[in-house]
UniProtKB/Swiss-Prot annotation:
The lineage of its organism: Bacteria, Bacillati, Bacillota, Clostridia, Eubacteriales. InterPro entries: Ribosomal_uS19, Ribosomal_uS19_bac-type, Ribosomal_uS19_CS, Ribosomal_uS19_SF. This is Small ribosomal subunit protein uS19. The keyword rRNA-binding applies. The keyword Ribonucleoprotein applies. The gene is rpsS. Disulfide bonds: none annotated. Keywords: Ribonucleoprotein, Ribosomal protein, RNA-binding, rRNA-binding. GO terms for cellular component: cytoplasm; small ribosomal subunit. GO terms for biological process: ribosomal small subunit assembly; translation. Pfam families: Ribosomal_S19. Gene3D superfamilies: 30s Ribosomal Protein S19, Chain A (3.30.860.10).
Length: 94
């Protein structure tokens, strides 16, 4: 279920403050954040934000196509290693 239109999109206030300060100074630094639920705003375009995936911070360059999505969508939390491979031993027993 999506968020109510009446409430508006959520952005972590500290993250938004850092972005606005960097835009005012015309800086481009990597910003670390744990706020995966924050919505990407147009002010964030062109910045690199390191989003926490549970183990490390994944750097994500924000482009125009990402506006409106959540930061967590671009930092996967699970890595799929694949199912067990077929070996000679497992196929010979059948």
């Amino acid at each position: 279920m999506s968020r109510s239109v009446k409430k508006g999109p959520y952005v972590d206030p500290k993250l938004l403050k850092k972005i606005e300060e960097m835009n005012a100074k015309n800086e481009k630094k990597v910003i670390k954040t744990w706020s995966r639920a924050s919505t990407i705003f147009p002010q964030m375009v062109g910045h690199t934000i390191a989003v926490h995936d549970g183990r490390k911070h994944v750097p994500i360059y924000i482009s125009e196509e990402m506006v409106g999505h959540k930061l967590g969508e671009f930092a996967p939390t699970r890595t799929f290693k694949g199912h067990g491979a077929h070996t000679e031993k497992s196929t010979a027993l059948k």
